[in-house]
């Protein structure tokens, strides 16, 4: 652990991003053992992922944003960076959602969203891949921002453990997300190798987002409270626009909600225990 305290935060963010990507790869590998899984189990997994993201948004992002602003001279305006960043994060994801072509899990290809290419329509597999990729980037960015914030005089064991806790939480919820993409692709007729490939590659943006997030806050330390809240807003948009609705459309509302609550508690306990 002492070795980690002396490393560049961008390098640490890269390692964390590679870890979360690796967790997606593990989840995608489920396709080698099952061609299909019950919709109820898939919904529970999505609920768990939503719970982790909601808890991470508050405990690991919004709360530190408010604390940082309070400790750095914002006074009675300490709420402003968190509020502004949170809203900007949601708006940014809405714009991406409106532009990038994608398809939510369980939907027919006719319900694809975003701007479709005129010359060649994207396949269902590609659209599902883009849907997962859209919300994997803010997860990686969130991890990167938490590590980048350590450069602002916060490179303590507690601060480092808090950032690691977020990475572990994101990694945990990436396992069901990987399965949630690879299994439907396999069920749609693709080979196990192709389903695994698409599922795994959907999170390649996470180490990229992690490096970008860490580098950005290192370059402009003043935006740390805004960046933390921005990542939280982006993640909450994904949860409310995609994860929760998708998990609630098949009549499994009770168990899905319980899955969400378990995910929330797991992430909350990890953040408090490690941070």
Predicted feature descriptions by range:
Residues 1-275:
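Intrinsically disordered, metal-sensing/regulatory segments
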């Amino acid at each position: 652990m002492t070795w980690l305290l002396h490393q560049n935060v961008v390098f640490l963010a890269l390692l964390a991003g590679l870890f979360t990507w690796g967790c997606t790869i593990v989840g995608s590998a489920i396709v080698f053992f099952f061609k299909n899984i019950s919709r109820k189990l898939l919904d529970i997994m999505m609920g768990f992922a939503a719970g982790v993201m909601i808890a991470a948004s508050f405990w690991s992002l919004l709360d530190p944003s408010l604390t940082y602003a309070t400790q750095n001279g914002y006074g009675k305006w300490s709420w402003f960076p968190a509020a502004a960043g949170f809203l900007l994060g949601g708006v940014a994801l809405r714009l991406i959602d409106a532009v990038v072509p994608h398809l939510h899990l369980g939907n027919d290809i006719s319900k694809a969203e975003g701007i479709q290419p005129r010359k060649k329509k994207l396949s269902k597999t590609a659209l599902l891949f883009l849907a997962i990729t859209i919300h994997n980037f803010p997860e990686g960015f969130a991890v990167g921002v938490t590590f980048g914030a350590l450069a602002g005089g916060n490179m303590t064991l507690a601060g480092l453990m808090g950032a690691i806790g977020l990475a572990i939480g994101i990694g945990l919820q990436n396992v069901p997300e990987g399965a949630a993409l690879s299994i439907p692709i396999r069920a749609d007729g693709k080979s196990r190798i192709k389903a695994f490939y698409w599922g795994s590659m959907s999170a390649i943006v996470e180490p990229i987002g992690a490096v970008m997030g860490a580098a950005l806050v290192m370059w402009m330390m003043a935006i740390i409270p805004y960046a933390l809240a921005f990542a939280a807003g982006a993640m909450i948009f994904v949860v409310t626009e995609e994860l929760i609705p998708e998990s609630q459309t098949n009549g499994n509302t009770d168990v899905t909600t319980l899955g969400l609550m378990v995910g929330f508690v797991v992430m909350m306990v990890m953040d408090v225990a490690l941070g």
